[in-house]
Regions:
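Flexible glycine/proline-rich, aromatic-decorated loop/lid segments
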Residues: 147-163, 374-377
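A short core secondary-structure module
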Residues: 119, 175-196
Length: 413
């Protein structure tokens, strides 16, 4: 309801909260001319959980402006960036500068895979019909080095359950005679990645395309300080697939990571048990042309095949999505380039990023429209982490850049 109010205040013709099979959608539109081009703005109002709360310097759901930054969960991902879009539209509408139609669709399930949005798009194709989709849910290299995201990785996600004995056992009475589910789980997942950083699941790389020489030259031209990178995340050394740079590893190559692992006794003090069960949550970032359904099944089959007979392994498939590559030779991308150049004084670099927005490929499939990913986040904005923030000056430059995108798009259209 709050997003509906904000969009109405900004000047849309109509805005409504629409039901879906999950969380509701917020739809709004401003129709300037039925014959004009239409830009659909996508964003999401859901956020990642704020835990652990004790690591926040401010209340995560009480926005604070301090030291030139907005501090709050969602300040960047994606409430802050979606609000940029609304304010840019408000300016254009107020000053009679809008020459094309605008539609907005904000969802509430992006962080869990956008499970309801695909069916919603299928049901409301005519309502959402557009010529291009504009998204601010990504980032730039730095305030001094603007960039436009031209590629996203896909995603597969699983939960693994390893069961040994049918109840917890005394580690003295049974230790050394019974397989420990936690030990087994740790070995199973550790064996997936080799010392060379390669994922050792058969068939995993079958559909992975190597970056072209031209793309690798472009990546090599992107300003990147490895020492600063390590310092910013607090590690002494980096690890990844041999033969690829850090930027290539995160933008052009797939990954396999344990997101959480638990089992046994984790309370204060000691409790000497062999646990009955152990669990892990695992994500794999995929590159374009990898099918997340195929990869999900490959992983299920792999763990079932290599699991020892001393335990029972259950692999549950969670949400997934396809990667996306944005062409850099179509009118909306050129408009975005000029929008950045006008505000930042530099032509933005085209970059692929490691994150995923699964619904982007669905938009193209169902609506036949390509997306332009004009994000303004920074690595230091701590999305998905405590103390998420957005620099106020960058937020304002984001609004100005989006305004200029629309003005330039009218020239192209």
């Amino acid at each position: 309801e709050r997003w509906k109010e904000l969009l109405l205040q900004a000047g849309v013709d109509k805005a409504e909260v629409m039901p879906s099979k999950g969380n509701p959608m917020v739809y709004a539109e401003r129709m300037v001319d039925p014959k004009a081009k239409t830009v659909l703005v996508y964003g999401h109002y859901d956020v990642m959980p704020a835990e652990p709360f004790e690591l926040w310097k401010t209340e995560p759901f009480e926005p604070v402006i301090k030291d030139g930054h907005i501090w709050a969960r969602g300040a960047d991902d994606d409430k802050g960036q979606s609000f940029m879009q609304a304010k840019a539209f408000e300016y254009l509408n107020k000053h009679n500068l809008l020459k094309h139609n605008m539609k907005f669709i904000f969802e509430g399930e992006e962080e869990i895979g956008s499970g309801s949005l695909g069916p919603f798009i299928e049901e409301h194709k005519d309502l959402l019909k557009c010529d291009v989709i504009l998204v601010s849910d990504t980032g730039i290299i730095s305030p001094d080095v603007p960039s436009i995201t031209t590629g996203l990785r896909g995603l597969s996600y699983w939960q693994i359950e390893v069961t040994g004995p049918d109840h917890d056992l005394h580690s003295g009475t049974f230790g050394g005679a019974v397989a420990n589910p936690i030990n087994v789980l740790c070995k199973l997942i550790a064996d997936v990645t080799g010392p060379d950083g390669k994922i050792r699941i058969p068939g995993f790389y079958d559909d992975v395309e190597e970056a072209s020489d031209e793309e690798r030259k472009l990546v090599a031209s992107i300003p990147f300080n490895e020492e600063e990178y390590k310092k910013s995340i607090g590690v002494k050394a980096l690890f990844g697939e041999e033969g690829y740079s850090t930027i290539e590893r995160t933008g052009y190559r797939p990954s396999f990571d344990v997101c959480g692992i638990w089992g046994g006794y984790t309370g204060d003090g000691a409790k000497t048990v062999i646990p009955s069960k152990a669990y892990a949550k695992i994500s794999s970032r995929l590159v374009p042309h990898q099918d997340h359904n195929k990869i999900s099944q490959l992983v299920v089959d792999y763990f079932n095949r290599v699991a020892p007979d001393t335990v029972t392994v259950k692999v549950e498939k969670h949400h997934g999505g396809y990667g996306y590559v944005c062409p850099i030779d179509f009118p909306a991308y050129k408009a975005a380039e000029r929008g950045f150049e006008t505000v930042f004084g530099k032509r933005p670099l085209p970059v692929r990023i490691g994150g995923s927005i699964p619904i982007i490929s669905t938009f193209e499939k169902l609506l036949g429209a390509k997306s332009v990913l004009m994000g303004f986040g920074l690595e230091s904005n701590a999305i998905h982490s405590p103390n998420e923030n957005m620099p106020v000056d960058l937020w304002l430059k984001g609004i100005e850049t989006i305004i200029n995108f629309h003005l330039e798009y009218d020239k192209e259209a």
